[in-house]
Each structure stands twice: as C-alpha cells, then as structure tokens.
Amino acid sequence: MKKIFLFFFAGVVLASCDLNFFPSDELNSDALLQDEAGAEYIMDGCYSLLKDEVEFLGYSSGNTFTRHFFQMSEFPADNCNLSSHTTDPLYEATALKMTDNLKNVGTLWMVGYKVIYMTNTIIETLVEGESADSDHLLGEAYFVRGWMHLNLATLYARPYSHGRDNIGIPLHISTNNAVVTRAKVGEVYDQIVKDLTKAS
C-alpha cells in the first residue's frame, strides 16, 4: 500500500510540473529586439566583448580584445622591448611574424566583427528621434561601429596614406551575414567618418 501511495504521489508531483524551456535569467534574440531596453543589453554586450576573455583556437586565458589590440598595434612599433623569447603571441607581434592562426590575430578579427554585428542590430532596431534614450544608444552604436572598423582597418589594411584604392577590410554595415569582399581603403574610411559624424 505504501508503494502505491508513493507512486501515486510521485505521479501527481511530476504531472504538475510546468517545465520552463527558456531560462528566466536569459533573453532570446526576439525579446532583445523589442525595445530600447533590449538594445541597451546588446550595447552592454559589445562593451563586455571588448574587455572579457573569449575562447578562440582553444585559448581563453588573457584572450581579450584590448590586450591583443595593444599587442598588435604597439609592440611592432618599437614602443616596448622584450627581454627574451617567449611562446606568447605577443612575441610574434613584436617580431612582425603575425599569421592568421595566432590567437591574437584571430581574436581581434572575430571579436571586432561580432561587435560590429551587434551594433548593426541596434542601428536596424531603433528608430532615430523616438526618444532621447534611443538616440543616445544609436549614437553609441554608430560610434562603436565606426571605431571598430577603424581598429580593424588600422591592423588589417594598408594605411590610408598609401592610397584610397588599396584593399581594405570587409565593410559590414548591416546584419546580413552574407560573405562580403574586402572594400577599398577609401570606402572603409568614408564609412568610418560617416559613422563617427552620425554618432556626434
């Protein structure tokens, strides 16, 4: 009799469970794109990607955008000296031996375009002039998109002073994930100026 009661009780308890398949501490993309509060979460995510460690090629320790950007922009310019050889990718940057399979090179590219995609999501979602808060978020999104394109162009394209017709970087100005060919340096810098002007 005890077993029957136990099975009956277990059946009632399990049958009354209402499983919540979506975690209550997370938002899905549809929920984020409904209002400016969601856009603010996306913008916060952009800033988090710039400072947080991300995993790339199996590495995550010290793998941050800001660290690698500093390594790849300052170390090759003789602004610092290393006392010995190291296996850290920072040495490769110092020795100008940067290849696409190094974690610092790949991390900057990956995080840079993730942030650009997130800013494009905000730009496509919010309507300019709807409120002061949405205009502020749009300004942030345009600024960060322009700034990220500038950082990527600085590291992966020929300098602007070498000519506007040189090959630049892929220019992403929408959330369309189609493969984009590399734009010319002049086109990239024109878009950077346009974004930064729009942000102000």
Predicted features, each with a name:
Residues 36-37, 52, 64-100, 109, ...:
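A structural signal for short, hydrophobic/glycine-enriched beta-strand patches
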Residues 43, 116-119, 189, 196:
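Inward-facing hydrophobic residues that define packing positions of alpha-helical scaffold repeats
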Residues 1-27:
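Bacterial Sec-dependent N-terminal signal peptides
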Residues 84-155, 178, 183-186, 200:
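Conserved, well-structured interaction surfaces
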Residues 17-66:
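Membrane-proximal, proline-rich intrinsically disordered regions
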Residues 52-56, 148-159:
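Secretory-pathway/luminal and periplasmic proteins that interact with or process carbohydrate-rich
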Residues 155-194:
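Short coil/linker segments at helix-helix boundaries
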